[in-house]
Structure formats: structure tokens, C-alpha cells
A protein has these predicted regions:
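Proteins enriched for Cys/Gly/acidic motifs involved in redox and nucleic-acid/cofactor modification
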Residues: 1-162
Length: 162
């Protein structure tokens, strides 16, 4: 376990990846060493950016959370934070069922994590990211949410209107 190191695990869509990259830039600006989707996480803190849209993605997110809860119980991790769509949609259920998580953040309030770590949000880096994709491309988040109300879709419930 490395001091001042945070492991960021991103699950789900490319919009989640953009959110993780923005968070990574903010954490680096606050002096943290950040790893992303490492096969061997070594940080003292982990942040899991979850997906809550389709069944398989929800299951993957919950399994990842439980895996890191076990690492925390074994003393390989000090703090565990969860953000993203899963915690946006199922916050109360997750808080009751997985108390090992130090705090859950929704899709839009992940910057509160900085305050909880005793760090500042750097507005000068508001649009900057720590890119995790190969140098020849990067994802661009154009919008968030959806105005449609399709009976089969949870996106407007999770992310709100466009």
C-alpha cells in the first residue's frame, strides 16, 4: 500500500471514463499519485466509478466493490469510495448493503470527494483531464442525460434531462 496513492477503477461507458479522467487531474493537482484500472492496485485509497445502467454492468460494479471491500478488510486498503451511475440510482440500498464503503458519491457530486480528502477543487483544471486513452484519440463528452422517457431505459432516471 503506497501512501498518497489513489487507485481509480472505471467501469461502464466512455462518459464515466471522462469523469474519471477529470477526477484524476484534480487528484494529481492535489499531490496524489494516481493509477487507473491497474491489475495490481497499490494505493491506500480506491475510487470505483460504477455503471448502473444494464444488469451485467451493475453486477460487474457490485462485484468490483465487494472485491475492494475484501481488500479493505484485509488491511490492503485504507479508504474506499464509490461514485457514478450505480450509486446515483441505488444510493440508499448500497449504503445499507455495503457499509464497508467509506462514502458513496453520485454521478454529479464526485468533486465532493476532494473536500472529504481535505483537498481543494482547482477550478483552473475544470476542463483538463488526465487522459488514459492512447495518444491518437480521446473521448469527448458532448452532453449528459436524455429528454426521452422510453419505458425500458434508465438513463433519464440516473442522469436527468439532456
Amino acid at each position: 500500500m503506497r501512501k498518497n496513492t489513489i487507485d481509480i477503477i472505471t467501469l461502464g461507458c466512455s462518459k464515466n471514463l471522462v469523469d474519471s479522467e477529470k477526477l484524476m487531474k484534480q487528484l494529481e493537482a492535489n499531490g496524489y499519485k494516481v493509477t487507473h484500472d491497474s491489475d495490481h492496485p497499490q494505493g491506500e485509497i480506491a475510487v470505483i466509478n460504477t455503471c448502473g445502467f444494464i444488469g451485467d454492468a451493475k453486477e460487474e460494479s457490485i462485484n468490483m466493490i465487494l472485491e475492494f471491500c475484501q481488500a479493505k478488510e484485509e488491511g490492503r486498503l485504507k479508504k474506499l469510495y464509490v461514485m457514478g451511475c450505480l450509486s446515483e440510482r441505488y444510493l440508499k440500498d448500497l449504503q445499507m448493503e455495503i457499509p464497508q464503503v467509506d462514502k458513496f458519491y453520485g454521478k454529479f457530486n464526485w468533486n465532493e470527494l476532494l473536500a472529504d480528502l481535505g483537498k481543494a477543487y482547482h477550478s483552473e483544471f475544470a476542463i483538463e483531464r488526465h487522459l488514459t486513452t492512447p495518444k491518437h484519440y480521446a473521448y469527448l463528452k458532448i452532453s449528459e442525460g436524455c429528454d426521452r422517457k422510453c419505458s425500458y431505459c434508465a438513463i433519464p432516471i440516473i442522469t436527468g434531462k439532456h
